[in-house]
Amino acid sequence: MNYIEEKVNRARSVLRELTSLKTSVKNETLLKVAELIDKNRDYIKEENRKDVEKAKEMGLRPAVVDRLVLNDKRIDGMVKVLKDVASLPDPVGEIIKMWNLPNGLKVGRMRVPLGVIFIVYESRPNVTIEASSLCMKSSNAVILRGGKEAINSNKALVNLIKEACRETGFPEDAVQFIDRSEREIVWEILKMEGKIDVAIPRGGESLIRAVVEHAKVPVIKHYKGVCNIYVDDEADLEKAYHIVYNAKVQRPSVCNAVENLVINRKILKEFFPKMAYYLGKAGVELRCDEESLQVIKENPKLSFVNAKPATEEDYYEEFLDLILAVKVVDDVDEAIAFIEKYGSKHSDAIITENYTKAMKFLREVDSAAVYVNASTRFTDGNEFGLGAEMGISTDKIHARGPMALEELTIPKFVILGEGQVRDNFGVPEEWMKEF
């Protein structure tokens, strides 16, 4: 048996045990992991230091190095995630719905685990804890393959998870870690139909496309977050200033940050100068269509704003930076058409006080999360009250939006009967009398 087969077979070997595991054991294990992480901060930070130093030697970008770092604040965050997941209701075995048929059968849907989940992710070691905790609580086995730049940090965290499992009786084979860096291992696992139930990539668009290209197993994903905010002519502009500013400036490098600002032409000259001023003060570069760029050029107070003409490609771009593309439209219909063409079906918002337009936007914008008068930055499992998340899905099969506990289960039909047979087609009565 080779390295990959052993890892996958170990994960599959505990699926039945996981399904029948008591919620109390799952919660106890998660809390034990939290305790061990809290107690072993020095060990975690020492292993993490090796990764950070190696990353700097390799010349990785500062943003990548920053995502690698595990300081006390981020360790506190991992401890909180574990405690939060432990406090959430256990979805496994929940009967979602039950109904009675005329023949007396009771038909229902029960939540059951997906099975073996393969997580492929990049530089953030926090994902090791987020993914493991969600899979453990939802009775899934997980195979973790983090980026090679975080291998020591991830190993340390998995060691603590397995130590907790041994102490509480949770099957430790439910958490498998790929501690080799060859890409070929990832491609081989992605082809293991029947053994891997689903793959979930977390990272940049190039990683996700590579996973989809090589996979023969189902993949739950989103390629990128080109989020849009439309400011309607009936918007409360005070709300709009704060919403747009938050969605772009608070944390520009995440997938739920806004990338395109769409403005109704009727309010362009009233709304955009102030908005451009606030964004410019925050260091945001604006890529404007002709009309919005002219507004900036005509206003001497905006001479400091870094604004340039937008290209067609800009509206498709996930900048993940302090850059915002701007487009002027006639009405809500044109705004929706723009979002349909350039957006990525992640998160989009309308700012308006008009109920009819708001409902039209909610119905017609085909995205995983659609907002009225709120920032797109809320698209997140914790912010939605779901607890930690495995990532955001923009797929239309199985799950859409934040992938939290319930999204790591699937419904199966359960049928309760009292001897019913279809069309009364049972053993003939005379045969019953003969023997």
From Swiss-Prot:
Claim: Amino-acid biosynthesis is one of the keywords in the record: yes
The organism's place on the tree of life at top rank: Bacteria
Gene Ontology MF term list: glutamate-5-semialdehyde dehydrogenase activity; NADP binding
GO biological-process terms attached to the record: L-proline biosynthetic process
PROSITE patterns cross-referenced by the UniProt entry: PROA
Coiled-coil parts of chain: none
Catalysis performed (reactions): L-glutamate 5-semialdehyde + phosphate + NADP(+) = L-glutamyl 5-phosphate + NADPH + H(+)
Keyword Protease attached: no
Recorded GO CC terms: cytoplasm
Stored Pfam families: Aldedh
Enzyme Commission number(s) from the entry: 1.2.1.41
Keywords annotated in UniProt: Amino-acid biosynthesis, Cytoplasm, NADP, Oxidoreductase, Proline biosynthesis
InterPro entries in the record: Ald_DH/histidinol_DH, Ald_DH_C, Ald_DH_N, Aldehyde_DH_dom, G-glutamylP_reductase_CS, Glu-5-SA_DH, GPR_dom
Subcellular location: Cytoplasm
PANTHER family given in the database record: DELTA-1-PYRROLINE-5-CARBOXYLATE SYNTHASE (PTHR11063:SF8), GLUTAMATE SEMIALDEHYDE DEHYDROGENASE (PTHR11063)
Known role: Catalyzes the NADPH-dependent reduction of L-glutamate 5-phosphate into L-glutamate 5-semialdehyde and phosphate. The product spontaneously undergoes cyclization to form 1-pyrroline-5-carboxylate.
NCBIfam families per UniProt: PRK00197.1, proA
Family: Belongs to the gamma-glutamyl phosphate reductase family.
Name listed for the protein in its UniProt record: Gamma-glutamyl phosphate reductase
Native species: Aquifex aeolicus (strain VF5)
